[in-house]
């Protein structure tokens, strides 16, 4: 199994999946560029072929047509084959680009197998050591009085413990070195990911800018066409309105002329009627005939003039109608042309809008990028004007470098503080042990001091000698300095010597108390430092989550997904937990339940949280509960014992009373007393 894992690890390491993914990514970009170039060259070739057909005579076109068709068929076959190859490459690229690299997992598995094998070796060695220790214990049980053997065994045990400790330290150092190497590799991968993200972001911004310029140009052209169309329509409308007014005037004049012609016709008919009457009246004088002839001639002249005027007006009306129809045709043709141009521009605008649908959030992204520039990448107001001229990639790189330097400084300070914290914890444990020893020593000294004070007040003769036997040897040695070499064995201590001994013990006690207070102050300082480090670690974790959120925002642009490591997965899970609607909903529900609780329930819950969140409070609560249980059990035991004693006492008294009655009043009223007792 280990050989298979090792061979797989070597194979995947030689295979270098990440390098293959980068090469495939580069090849995909080159293919995309070549597709664009092929499309442009194809368009140019089509235009050149059209120009060739236009500028080439018919017989030459007929001769070249088969060659062109075969050449075009070969080009179509080559383009089809290249498209199929590109499609197959893109299919392989899509499947391989998101495949995670199994080298770290295989490396970790191999290391775990090595660790398991090493653990088995250590276990076997430990078993051997245990067997050896059991043998030594048997030998030690057999030869208890051999001090040399005991010392040798102790030395061997110390050596074994030292070897185990050294092995544990070497394993810890190897693990720390491995973690440092993994962290450096992850930082390098993160930098590469950020560089690729910035390049893709730059390409996307360039495309968006080009599309934006094309859209603005199209909008300006469309606006110019609309303004021209509006101006021409207004001019044509004004011209048509003028022509219509002229036409109405001509129609009015024609109607007036027709009415005048009708009146003249009526007058002519009346004149003809009068002429007929005059012809009938032939006997009339010559003067009247002359007058009638004159009136008839004048009416005829006037009628001819009116008819000429009517004909001229009819010609004017026809001419105006012809010009109106011509103007309508011209305006209709111009309107159709403008409508065609407008439809073409609208189709172009729709195409551009469809192209911009993928970048519909350009303004929002631009606004967010400006906000990011202003908030995250501008350290001061003076540097804001200088950073405004820098591109986003430079700002991201500078921010990444500053964050890396801050992270390194914080890591160094964290390691220093953790070392100091470990030293302080060791010191605190030593101080606590020393304090406990000092407390025990103080208690013994106080007990000995009370014994010495009781010696000064003997109850009777010989009591001092009896109590001097209870004094420990160190106190006897300490008091021997005050007695002198010929101190009486049966007398009381002098008052000055006891006072000096009390002053020594009290000063030593004060020194121990001051030292204990110093150690407690150092312990509080160490606890405060630990809390500050914990808060700083929480803030760093929050900053890392925010940085991961920004990286995820930058990775939201179209592109291949980069391989994720353990750190990214951990911060990704924390980021998803922050964005999880179920967790936020559960928090809101817990808050709502907490607000709907009664005040005493809130007090009980707060007290429980306070007790469970603090180690000292948990310890106090545990011992307090234990004390209450013991007290209740003691009270119950006392009550049961008192009741049993009362019962036993009552039984004993009744028995004694019955014995007394049987013994002393046996003859008189023994039966009555028995009935009374029953």
Swiss-Prot record:
One of its GO terms (molecular function) is DNA-binding transcription factor activity, RNA polymerase II-specific. Residues 641-678 are lumenal. Keywords: Coiled coil, Disulfide bond, Golgi apparatus, Membrane, Phosphoprotein, Transmembrane, Transmembrane helix, Transport. Residues 67-450, 502-556 form a coiled coil. It is found in: Golgi apparatus membrane. Pfam families: CASP_C, CUX1_N. Residues 1-619 are cytoplasmic. The modification Phosphoserine is found at residue 586. The chain crosses the membrane at residues 620-640. Belongs to the CASP family. May be involved in intra-Golgi retrograde transport. Homodimer; disulfide-linked. Interacts with GOLGA5. This is Protein CASP. The gene is CUTL1.
């Amino acid at each position: 199994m280990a050989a298979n894992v090792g061979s797989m690890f070597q194979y995947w390491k030689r295979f270098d999946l990440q390098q293959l993914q980068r090469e495939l990514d580069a090849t995909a970009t080159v293919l995309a560029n070549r597709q664009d170039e092929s499309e442009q060259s194809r368009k140019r070739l089509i235009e050149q072929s059209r120009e060739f057909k236009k500028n080439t005579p018919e017989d030459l076109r007929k001769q070249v047509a088969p060659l062109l068709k075969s050449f075009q068929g070969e080009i179509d076959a080559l383009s089809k084959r290249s498209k199929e190859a590109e499609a197959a490459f893109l299919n392989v690229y899509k499947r391989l680009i998101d495949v995670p690299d199994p080298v770290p997992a295989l490396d970790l598995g191999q290391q775990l197998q090595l660790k398991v094998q090493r653990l088995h070796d250590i276990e076997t060695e430990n078993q051997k050591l245990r067997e050896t220790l059991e043998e030594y214990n048997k030998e030690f049980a057999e030869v208890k009085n051999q001090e040399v053997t005991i010392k040798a065994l102790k030395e061997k045990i110390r050596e074994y413990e030292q070897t185990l400790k050294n092995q544990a330290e070497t394993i810890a150092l190897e693990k720390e070195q491995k973690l440092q190497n993994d962290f450096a590799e992850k930082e390098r991968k993160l930098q590469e990911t950020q560089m690729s993200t910035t390049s893709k972001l730059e390409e996307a911004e360039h495309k968006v800018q080009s599309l934006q310029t094309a859209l603005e140009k199209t909008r300006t052209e469309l606006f110019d066409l609309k303004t021209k169309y509006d101006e021409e329509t207004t001019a044509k409308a004004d011209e048509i309105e003028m022509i219509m007014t002229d036409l109405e005037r001509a129609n009015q004049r024609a109607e007036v002329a027709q009415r005048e012609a009708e009146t003249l016709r009526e007058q002519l008919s009346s004149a003809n009627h009068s002429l007929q009457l005059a012809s009938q009246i032939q006997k009339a004088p010559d003067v009247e005939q002359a007058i009638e002839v004159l009136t008839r001639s004048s009416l005829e002249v006037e009628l001819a003039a009116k008819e000429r005027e009517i004909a001229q007006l009819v010609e004017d009306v026809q001419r105006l109608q012809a010009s109106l129809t011509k103007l309508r045709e011209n305006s209709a043709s111009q309107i159709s042309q403008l409508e065609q141009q407008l439809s073409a521009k609208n189709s172009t605008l729709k195409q551009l809008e469809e192209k911009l649908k993928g970048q519909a959030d350009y303004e929002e992204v631009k606004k967010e990028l400006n906000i990011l520039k202003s908030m995250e990448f501008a350290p001061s107001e003076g540097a804001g004007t200088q950073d405004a001229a820098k591109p986003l990639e430079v700002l991201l790189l500078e921010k990444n470098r500053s964050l890396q330097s801050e992270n390194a400084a914080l890591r160094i300070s964290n390691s220093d503080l953790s070392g100091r914290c470990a030293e302080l914890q060791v010191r605190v444990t030593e101080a606590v042990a020393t304090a406990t020893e000092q407390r025990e020593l103080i208690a013994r000294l106080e007990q000995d001091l009370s014994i010495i004070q009781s010696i000064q007040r003997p109850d009777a003769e010989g009591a001092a000698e009896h109590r001097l036997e209870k004094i420990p040897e160190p106190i006897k040695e300490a008091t021997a300095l005050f007695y002198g070499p010929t101190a009486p064995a049966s007398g009381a201590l002098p008052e000055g010597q006891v006072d000096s001994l009390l002053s020594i013990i009290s000063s030593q006690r004060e020194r121990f108390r001051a030292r204990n207070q110093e150690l407690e102050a150092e312990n509080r300082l160490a606890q405060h430092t630990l809390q500050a480090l914990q808060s700083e670690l929480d803030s760093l974790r929050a900053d890392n989550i925010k940085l991961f959120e920004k990286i995820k925002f930058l990775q939201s642009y179209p592109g291949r997904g980069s391989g994720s490591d353990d750190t990214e997965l951990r911060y990704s899970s924390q980021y998803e937990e922050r964005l999880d609607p179920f967790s936020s909903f559960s928090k809101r529900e817990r808050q709502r339940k907490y607000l709907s609780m009664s005040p005493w329930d809130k007090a009980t819950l707060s007290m429980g949280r306070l007790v469970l969140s603090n180690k000292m409070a948990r310890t106090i609560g545990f011992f307090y509960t234990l004390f209450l249980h013991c007290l209740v059990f003691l009270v119950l035991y006392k009550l049961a014992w008192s009741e049993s004693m009362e019962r036993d006492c009552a039984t004993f008294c009744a028995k004694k009373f019955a014995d007394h009655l049987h013994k002393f009043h046996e003859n008189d009223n023994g039966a009555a007393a028995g009935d009374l007792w029953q």
